[in-house]
């Protein structure tokens, strides 16, 4: 799942950045 979040990071807007960032930090 982390791979999907990482791939979405550049595609998603900065608004989702903090949400995805939290997931990456947890992993």
Curated annotation (Swiss-Prot):
Entries under InterPro entries matching the protein: Amanitin/phalloidin
Swiss-Prot/TrEMBL keywords: Toxin
Positions of the pro-segment in this chain: 1-10, 19-27
GO molecular function: toxin activity
Post-translational modification: Processed by the macrocyclase-peptidase enzyme POPB to yield a toxic cyclic octapeptide. POPB first removes 10 residues from the N-terminus. Conformational trapping of the remaining peptide forces the enzyme to release this intermediate rather than proceed to macrocyclization. The enzyme rebinds the remaining peptide in a different conformation and catalyzes macrocyclization of the N-terminal 8 residues.
Cyclopeptide (Leu-Pro) crosslink site(s): 11-18
Source taxon at top rank: Eukaryota
Described purpose of this protein according to its UniProt entry: Probable toxin that belongs to the MSDIN-like toxin family responsible for a large number of food poisoning cases and deaths.
Family from the record: Belongs to the MSDIN fungal toxin family.
Protein name: MSDIN-like toxin proprotein 7
Lineage of the organism: Eukaryota, Fungi, Dikarya, Basidiomycota, Agaricomycotina
